[in-house]
Amino acid sequence: MKKWLMLVVFSLIFVGLVACSNNDESAGSDSDGGSDDTVELDFWIFGSTGYDQLVEEYMKDNPNVKININEGEMNDMHNNLFTSISAGSGGAPDIAQIEISQVEKFQEAQDQFYNLVDYGAEDVSSNFLDWKWAQAQSADGSFQIGLPTDIGPTTMFYRTDVMEEAGLPIDREEVAAQIDSWEAYYETAKTIKDKTGKPISDSPQLVFNSLRDQLEQQYFNEEDELIIEDTVKEAYDYTTKMIEEGLVGKNELWEPEWGSAMAEGSYATMPGAPGWMVANVKANAPDTSGKWDIAKIPEGAGNWGGSFLTIPKQSEYPEEAFEFISWLTAPEQQLKSFEIAGLFPSTPDVYENEDFLATTDEFYNNAPTAKIFAEAAQSVKTVYMGVNYSIVDTELGTALLNVAIEGADPEKEWDAAVERINSQLERQ
């Protein structure tokens, strides 16, 4: 945990405050004459989950359990959680939501979490997609750090008006048939550029990520050896070729320009778009209803996002916490989370629910969104991410943006990114 030393130092104040808060709440309960039979669980979450409604439902049916939700920003919550478990006592919640990109880091500290296998995790494993379950499991299958919540199977959003302007099909089945490979995507991009002057995508990162996420091996093998030359270099070369030919734009993910471009109709497709992107586009481009649709992504779906519910060792109520999270992640509740907040279920039983499959979205030309994402979810491959995944991802993203924005040489940018990656890995 040496690499987390600075993080621990800078976040200790948070731990102290949370610990004091917990002590004050406990004292308040005693002075109010609260029952000793009441179990109080602190639950840390991030993002829009809809869990507050489900927690109320659970507490109504289980009056001996009180659940306190602490909702925060994603990075802050993960940093504070690691600080709390590193401190060894006080401050950590009974239940913590952990995002997929952070799971490997916390698995390195699995001695600070309860092994959910000991509480019956294997009895509920069949509820979930195999690849999702494996993401929170040790290599030998003996340790399960969390139960799966939502997932982010990827598709391809597209602007029907831009496709039509280019003289291309706009029916989602016809679009999927025309763009059924990355070679076909490239050829379609040339047509769109020629007919409209617009790129097929505004984001180099999304194009690269889409190809990367279809691979069974990406940045590291299971021995944590860097393998990018043999895996994602081809995706990088494909993306930079399209950048240099003016077929892919220059917008950086999550920057204001990326959001505003959704409303402008300045590009044709958004490859690698997961279920949660549905709401993101609506928020950034509310006046474009009916101009978007959703098709299959060329050559198979990947996954972008999703979380797990874990139980830190500092909890005094692991059995009660497990009982709650096994209920919350069950198919019935995952369906409710989808209906409330749009969290896409990781429980395939939901994919057979008639009401679920009938879900359409008027904004996306009445696309059967649940059906499309369910089909994508079942084609995702299991991928080992590695504890240093974000280091590689950040540096390759920087290289792509330098090529797109600065006109930098792709090979020089790749070599520089590899050098930066290796330098950082040596310090871990």
Name what the model sees in each region.
Residues 60, 68, 121, 138-207, ...:
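Helix-loop-helix "hinge/cap" segment bordering the ligand-binding cleft or interdomain interface
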Residues 1-40, 60, 419-428:
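Short, low-complexity disordered leader/linker segments with a strong preference
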Residues 36-47, 65-70, 94-95, 145, ...:
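Short, well-ordered beta-strand elements
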Residues 244, 354, 358-359, 374-428:
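Conserved C-terminal helix/tail region of periplasmic/extracytoplasmic solute-binding proteins
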Residues 99-155, 164, 183-186, 289-296, ...:
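Hinge/lid segment of periplasmic solute-binding proteins
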Residues 52-59, 103-105, 207-214, 231-323:
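Extracytoplasmic/periplasmic substrate-binding proteins
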Residues 57, 61-128, 146, 165-167, ...:
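Extracytoplasmic "Venus flytrap"/periplasmic binding protein-like
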Residues 279-282, 307-390, 412:
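Mature extracytoplasmic/periplasmic domains
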